[in-house]
């Protein structure tokens, strides 16, 4: 069973990975693949099953590394909507991952 805190930590790591994706790609040839890629793949597979608005906000926050303010402006939502959507993202992953275990 995965906790909400674990999901939040993994999402932070995913965001970090995407913010430095080129560095990770360059290091792959000389060092090898970092373990974060397995986490990224797992989360990306799960988010594909999310409702469209949850998916859209996930991409903006975690793949494109936007702040809440930048995501709100880019997507045409309020900052509070993005904040609430991020909670829905965490809840979505929590439910999906804990159903896998059950």
Over which residues does each language-model region extend?
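Helix-turn-helix DNA-binding module
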Residues: 64-81
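Generic hydrophobic/packing signal
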Residues: 42-46, 58, 81, 89
